Every structure is written in C-alpha cells, then in structure tokens.
Amino acid sequence: MKRILALVLSVLMVLCLFAGCGKDEEKSPDAPDVNGDGLNKNEVVNGPINPLTGEKVSEDNSDLRPYCVMINNHPDARPSVGLSQASIIYEALAEGGITRMMAVFNDVDGITVGSLRSARPYYISMAQAYDAIYIHAGGSEQAYSDIKTLGIDNMDGVRGARSGEASSYYRDQTRLSQGKNVEHTLFADGSKLASFCKNNYELKHDSSYDNTYG
C-alpha cells in the first residue's frame, strides 16, 4: 500500500512539474520590459537630427560647424558652467594627474561656458575631426604650433588680439572674491563667441564634410 501511495505521489509531482513548465508566466502590467519587446526596433526617425548625437531635433543644423570648448576640470574650478548644453564631452589627462575636458556644442549663442583652460595638441586633433571652431584660453607651445600649421579656426582668451576676441572672455568676480586662483575664473560669453565667429569664420561645413549621422 505504501509503495502504491508513493508511486501515485511521484506521478502527481511529475505532472505538476510539466504543467508549471508549459505555462507562460503572466507579466505584471507594471513590470519593466527587460527584453525590449515593447520597442519598435525598425522605427525610422523622420525629420532633422542632431548631427552629434543622432537625436531628433526640431530644426536641421547639420550643415553648421560645432564649437569645441576647453573646460577646466580641476577640483578648485568646479562647478563648471554650460556643460549641460553640450552634445559631447571629452575628458583626458592634462598634467599632474588632473583631467581637462573638451565640450562639443552645436551652438554657443546665449549660453555661458567655463571655466576655460588652454589648448593641447590631442584636443586640437579631436576638434579637427568635427571641423569645429576651437575655443580655448592659452595653450602649450606645441598646441599653438599645431593651430597655425593645421589652420585651425580658433578663439584664444589669452593671446587673442583680434577685435572682439579677448573681450568675449571675462573673469568671474564672485570666484575671485572667494579666493580662487585666477586660472579657475575665466569664462566666456557664448553670444559674443558666436558673434565673433560669424564675423571671422565660415560657419557652415564644407560640402565634402561627412557628418557622424545623416
């Protein structure tokens, strides 16, 4: 009798096991779609897109050159200003174990950016890849040599001598009053940067330039 009962129980357990495996688990309506089943993987974005990020935008500006701005990332220079408006931000070691950033903007008109720092050759190479206008405050001698040799369109807040160039930069008086070192206090008025570039440089890409997206 015990053997028969054990056999019956074993059969019932096997049947329950198969029944559980054969039934799809019901998804909670609030559960996240971890498999991405709700995504339209074949969706095509119609209309203009940000040439730097691929995101959909209201106005097509893919023919406009971006601005690459050198940003101070020393702890004493924080918080930085304007980074939230950038499409791309590069960060790399400069010297002394401190990193420096280069923010890539579709447009700088109407924003404040800073604090600003000097040019470095590897950042110049990055900016050149975007056919960008390079915004900096000073630079190493090699950086100045590369800017001249490569013909980089740039604005310099230290040696810039053209009308409207150096005046686009200013020292933040609040930071100075807080006792911050002067190299952590230089900012730029984006509207003045844009105005200077409009008067001195071609703002549109050459027809041969190939955008990242498009």
Summary of predicted features, one role per range:
Residues 1-8:
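Positively charged n-region of N-terminal signal peptides that target proteins for export
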Residues 22-24:
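Bacterial signal peptide processing site
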Residues 27:
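Catalytic/regulatory signature loops of cyclic-dinucleotide turnover enzymes
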